């Protein structure tokens, strides 16, 4: 049997960077690593609650997180949240031409999120260790560029269609038609596993357009996997994208 390596971890230091950047003494490493886990978990939970409260009609009405990067400097924690959304309310705006109402709503979301994170991670125990209570959390929400070539957003679009009972072949065709129009995308591969279209026997189906050179370390590969919760059970979704070098 072939052994598969994670496409992103395989390329850290070449085409990708670590999601968390900080240095700490070895005895405190597990503590901060667990704190990073709590930060990411609470961010996803916060935006899930926010999306559900908006009664979204489709995926474009929701706020989809594509990446979370954490940087630490002394007692400050900088969190960059990359999101894909058509709703400009969530983005930090600047300049004289910006709508004051958008600024207020954007700042309100950031302030609420900072309070939630500070409350959840400012004080917890891991064995006999305690985290520093004086940590300051600074959240920045950034619009994710080129969402149609982002593996996370492509997977979210497919999952949204599958959960809305769109036949999987039609959903795949719609996504491939969109990705083929992207000039900076050299290839895309999508795999779905489970009870496709409600058939009793589970199976896997995959499609590919262009090239996906997984063994080439210098290739700019994006990858994401998630599950779709359907009436007939869970469907596993995996997406690989290969972007041209800019």
From Swiss-Prot:
The record's subcellular location field reads:
Plastid, Chloroplast
Might you report a single GO cellular component term?
Answer: chloroplast
Q: In terms of domain of life, where is this protein from? A: Eukaryota
- The primary site where this protein sits is plastid
Kindly list the GO molecular function terms attached to this UniProt entry: rRNA binding; structural constituent of ribosome
The record, for Pfam families, names: Ribosomal_S3_C
Q: Record's Gene3D superfamilies? A: 3.30.300.20, Ribosomal protein S3, C-terminal domain
- InterPro entries associated with the record: KH_dom-like_a/b, KH_sf_prok-type, Ribosomal_S3_C_sf, Ribosomal_uS3_bac-typ, Ribosomal_uS3_C
KW Ribosomal protein (keyword) present: yes
Q: What keywords are annotated for this sequence in UniProt? A: Chloroplast, Plastid, Ribonucleoprotein, Ribosomal protein, RNA-binding, rRNA-binding
- Does the record bear Ribonucleoprotein in its keywords? yes
* GO process annotations (BP): translation
* Protein family membership: Belongs to the universal ribosomal protein uS3 family.
Under the subunit heading, UniProt states:
Part of the 30S ribosomal subunit.
NCBIfam families attached to this UniProt entry: rpsC_bact (TIGR01009)
Instruction: Please identify the protein, giving its name as recorded.
Output: Small ribosomal subunit protein uS3c
Taxonomy-wise, where does this protein's organism fall, top ranks first?
Answer: Eukaryota, Sar, Rhizaria, Cercozoa, Chlorarachniophyceae
């Amino acid at each position: 049997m072939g052994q598969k390596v994670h496409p992103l971890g395989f390329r850290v230091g070449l085409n990708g960077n670590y999601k968390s950047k900080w240095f700490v003494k070895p005895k405190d490493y597990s503590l901060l690593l667990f704190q990073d886990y709590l930060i990411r978990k609470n961010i996803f939970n916060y935006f899930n609650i926010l999306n559900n409260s908006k009664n979204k009609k489709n995926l474009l009405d929701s706020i989809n997180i594509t990446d979370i990067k954490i940087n630490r400097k002394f007692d400050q924690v900088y969190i960059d949240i990359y999101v894909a959304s058509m709703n400009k309310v969530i983005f930090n705006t600047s300049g004289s031409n910006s709508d004051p109402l958008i600024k207020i709503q954007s700042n309100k979301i950031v302030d609420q999120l900072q309070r939630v994170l500070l409350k959840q991670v400012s004080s917890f125990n891991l064995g006999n260790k305690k985290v520093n209570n004086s940590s300051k959390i600074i959240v920045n929400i950034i619009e994710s560029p080129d969402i149609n070539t982002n593996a996370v957003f492509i997977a979210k679009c497919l999952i949204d269609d599958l959960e809305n009972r769109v036949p999987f072949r039609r959903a795949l065709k719609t996504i491939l038609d969109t990705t083929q129009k992207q000039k900076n995308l050299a290839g895309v591969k999508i795999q779905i596993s489970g009870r496709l279209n409600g058939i009793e026997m589970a199976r896997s189906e995959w499609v590919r357009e262009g090239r996906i050179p997984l063994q080439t370390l210098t290739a700019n590969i994006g990858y994401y996997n998630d599950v779709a919760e359907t009436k007939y059970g869970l469907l596993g979704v995996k997406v690989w994208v290969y972007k041209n070098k800019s």
